[in-house]
Amino acid sequence: MGFRVLVLVVMATTFALPFTFFEEPGRSPFRPALRSEEAQALRHGLTLLLARRADGQPPDMRQPEMRRPEMRRPEVRQPEFAELSVGQRRWDVDQCMYYCLTGVVGYSYTECETMCT
């Protein structure tokens, strides 16, 4: 019962609003208008998306320059095991893991373990 009353109140309120509330017919003053170039870009993007879906391709519409650059893994030179003592090897692996895990790139533990061992 309460939901029906709420719906009726909302319908009556929106019907009772004067048409001068809107700046232009069909356009709300609270929603910013799209500029013509933005509207054209939006239409173009939607056209590309629909074309890709029709072709069965993934819907990645971003331009190549807007895509996130691929992160390259830093090359970690592993010294020969004969060169280092057991304690030195363990320290180097631990240091490699520390720098890998706390670095800017944000590798997972498994990725760091693969690179450092």
Swiss-Prot record:
GO MF term (any one): toxin activity
Propeptide: 23-90
Comp. bias (Basic and acidic residues): 62-77
Chief localisation class: secreted
TM helices/strands, residue ranges: none
Covalent S-S links between cysteines: 96-116, 100-112
GO cellular component: extracellular region
Comment on protein domains: The cysteine framework is XIV (C-C-C-C).
Family under the similarity heading: Belongs to the conotoxin R superfamily.
Protein name: Conotoxin vil14.2
Organism: Conus villepinii (Villepin's cone)
Upper classification of the organism: Eukaryota, Metazoa, Spiralia, Lophotrochozoa, Mollusca
